Amino acid sequence: MNRIALHQSSVHPLDPVELVQLAATAGVDSIGLRVAAVDEVQQWWSRGIGSPVLHSLIPVLLSTRVTVLDVGRVHLGPELRVVDSQHAYVRALELGVRLGAQFVTARATPDVTDDPAELFAILAELARRFQLRALITVVPGTPVATLDQARAVVADTGGGIVLDVSPRTHTADTVDELVVELGPALGYVRVPAAELADGGTPGLLATLPPQVAVAIGGSPTGEPVPQETMDVDQLGRVRALRAAVDAMLRHPSAAH
């Protein structure tokens, strides 16, 4: 059975504890957390593993049995060559292992000229030491702007790729082909919350392997959802998002 995760970017500006409580009440299995390299999370995670929110969050995760799918984000930059606890990537790794996350997510940035494959390989090795698997996200306008570029970056590293799926533009056959092409490089599937508002596309993810999680996220570029989307009943909204993902995972033959 595919795990469904609610990413923090889809319910901004909830704090991590509120995110877990919302996910649990809405029947969502997991969450995705931003813990570094984003200004909006500094209020919670600026002290890394010494942040008070960590000590509030762990008991809530345990009591609700909500798991952490991934922590992010890590920017692929030259600082990865130097192990320094002050760097954002170290914070992500340290918090990821303490929260029991499966993945740490990274992205290339437009202003870094270093080879992203070299930098990702460094991150993938560091992540293994923290019992995490590094994943790369495809971001337009960066050196990793396509799936082909992402596959080249993660090759032979043990890392993987976040596959962005759009209910508005992808078909079930396209998704199936992408999953087969990525093979073991597939980390998890991410679907923009905005494209689930109308119920998504039933059966779109029906052939997704059961071990592959589906994350409800913000936009593919990682930006939070618009504020007007947030000015609604959040519990009802998240329950509807979860129902839309369930429908996309359900094979058409299951209805007969």
Question: How should these model regions be labeled?
Answer:
Residues 129-149:
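Conserved anion-binding
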Residues 96-114:
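Active-site groove signature of glycoside hydrolases
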Residues 49-65, 118-129, 178, 202-207:
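Catalytic-core regions built around general acid/base machinery
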Residues 1-5, 13, 17-27, 90, ...:
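Histidine-acidic metal/acid-base catalytic patches
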Residues 1-91, 97, 101, 132, ...:
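N-terminal pre-domain/capping segments
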Residues 10-12, 35-37, 74-77, 108-112, ...:
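Active-site-proximal loop/turn and secondary-structure-junction residues that shape catalytic pockets
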Residues 49-52, 111-122, 143-146, 172-173:
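Active-site-adjacent beta->alpha loops and helix N-cap segments on the catalytic face
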Residues 2-9, 31-33, 68-73, 104-106, ...:
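Hydrophobic faces of well-ordered beta-strands that scaffold small-molecule active sites
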